[in-house]
Amino acid sequence: MPTGLDSWRKLMDRIHEIIVVEGRHDTQRLKKYFDCETIETGGSSIDDKVIEQIRHAASRRGVIVFTDPDTPGNQIRHIINQHVPNCKNAFVDKHNARTEKKVGIEHADKDTLWNALQNVVTITNAPKGSLVTYLNLV
């Protein structure tokens, strides 16, 4: 017999792809609102093991790169997109993901996160600088 938590999980929005985030607070925030799996990069010095984990996830279910709307987040996104082609990318505006002192997806509300996940883009064979140009437009 299902418990109350099981019923709640069925009502939560299920994300098929595995979401790549920077850290555990991002994971906690996403799992608060969505039924999803994440891979945490642990910061901007992404090691080969994490890249391989992302490659494996991309081949199984696909991945969505969802990093913070700041310089380190953009650097992480760039590294992942260079090493793992055809990733989907979710973006939030930094004004919708901040506190007084910090910027990060862990500070965004459910609607902001959901809108970002519904409007993912895939960057393919992008010339250098095009991701930065795109980020300046959003």
PLM region spans:
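Aromatic-enriched hydrophobic runs in primary sequence
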Residues: 8-9, 28, 138
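Short alpha-helix boundary/capping motifs
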Residues: 20-21, 70
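Conserved beta-strand elements of the Class I
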Residues: 18-20, 64
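Short, polar loop motifs at secondary-structure junctions
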Residues: 23-27
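TOPRIM fold recognition
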Residues: 13, 32-37, 44-138
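A short, flexible N-terminal coil/short beta segment enriched in small residues
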Residues: 2-18
